[in-house]
């Protein structure tokens, strides 16, 4: 069973979805039964835009951070849709999407400078997947 569509989730519905949840924010966002439509390729930049570390516990997020996260989800998914979707997906006519790894802000950019602060983007392990973070823009504590 899929959760609600991530794109366009309302400013009331999103906090309600997170209320009382345990676990880390990245794991929650990747679970399609919680929120449908966010793949691992998008998650790095969504969390970066919201300035949230992927290992942050959901219960520690402030209302302001939750709203920033909701806005980052909308912005990142809308940007991909405007470009025809992700490069690894095809449309009904077999045409691949135009949103490529080169369009990502920090995703898959380990060792490169952060586009906001210049710190080095790091690759960290988050459960069964890896995640790219800026240690300055997305502090864990």
Tell where the protein language model's regions lie, with residue ranges.
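Basic, amphipathic alpha-helical segments enriched in Lys/Arg and hydrophobic/aromatic residues
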Residues: 65-82
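Short Cys/His-rich Zn2+-coordinating modules
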Residues: 92-104, 115-119
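Short functional micro-motifs and their immediate structural scaffolds
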Residues: 121-122, 139
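RNA substrate-recognition surfaces in RNA-acting enzymes
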Residues: 51-60, 66
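Short cysteine-rich clusters marking metal-coordination/redox-active sites
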Residues: 114-117, 134-137
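Short, flexible, mixed-charge glycine/proline-rich loop motifs
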Residues: 101-110, 124-127
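Phosphate/anion-contacting hairpin/loop surfaces
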Residues: 1-49, 57
């Amino acid at each position: 069973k899929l959760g609600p569509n991530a794109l366009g989730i309302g400013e009331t519905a999103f906090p309600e979805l997170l209320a009382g949840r345990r676990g880390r924010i990245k794991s929650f966002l990747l679970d399609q039964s919680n929120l449908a439509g966010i793949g691992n390729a998008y998650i790095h930049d969504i969390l970066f835009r919201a300035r949230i570390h992927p290992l942050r516990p959901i219960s520690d997020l402030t209302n302001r951070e939750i709203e920033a996260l909701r806005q980052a989800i909308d912005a990142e998914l809308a940007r991909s849709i405007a470009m025809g979707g992700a490069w690894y997906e095809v449309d009904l006519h077999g045409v691949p999407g135009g949103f490529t790894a080169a369009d990502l802000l920090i995703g898959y950019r380990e060792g490169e400078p952060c586009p906001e602060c210049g710190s080095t983007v790091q690759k960290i392990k988050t459960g069964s997947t890896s995640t790219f973070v800026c240690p300055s823009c997305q502090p864990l504590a």
